[in-house]
């Protein structure tokens, strides 16, 4: 849409997908967006129906809110904010979560939102990329639900190096 508004709408039903022979359904939720509450409810209902039919569910699980940028730092890929989005995603029955690789941490404290504890940042995580990805996995029921990290905008010449880094971290 233009202008960009972080919203996804259902283009078909789970039953239609099932009748066409699909074995899985997917959806996107933009956690933090103005539409996220509606998206969570709609996707939860769709995923419940998919599981009734024996289908797998995949959720593109992204954070989107202008308030997630603070003092020149973009926390949209913060391990704690994306981890919370992942947790909400698996709670509404996503079998697989697609998430961007975390690039920083401390989004909750930076934007002064949510409840957290200093130990999360001082003792339970580090700023190492593998540790940040582990934090995301922990928020997917300690890895019982699948997590795929990939994506992001193309940067041209460094795309291959970034793909190798993501594969190594995963």
Enumerate the predicted regions with their spans.
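Alpha/beta enzyme core
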Residues: 1-148, 154-170
């Amino acid at each position: 849409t233009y202008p960009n508004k972080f919203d996804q709408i259902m283009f078909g039903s789970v039953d239609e997908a099932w009748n066409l022979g699909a074995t899985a359904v997917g959806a996107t939720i933009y956690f933090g967006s103005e539409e996220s509450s509606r998206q969570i409810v709609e996707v939860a209902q769709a995923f419940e129906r998919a599981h009734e039919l024996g289908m797998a569910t995949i959720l593109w699980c992204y954070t989107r809110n202008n308030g997630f940028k603070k003092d020149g730092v973009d926390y949209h890929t913060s391990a704690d904010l994306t981890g919370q989005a992942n947790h909400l995603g698996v709670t509404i029955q996503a079998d697989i979560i697609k998430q961007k690789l975390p690039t920083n941490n401390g989004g909750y404290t930076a934007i002064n939102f949510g409840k957290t504890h200093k130990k999360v940042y001082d003792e339970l995580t580090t700023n190492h990329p593998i540790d940040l990805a582990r934090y995301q996995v922990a928020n997917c029921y300690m890895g019982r639900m699948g997590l795929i990290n990939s994506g992001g905008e193309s940067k041209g010449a460094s795309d291959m190096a970034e793909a190798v880094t993501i594969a190594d971290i995963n």
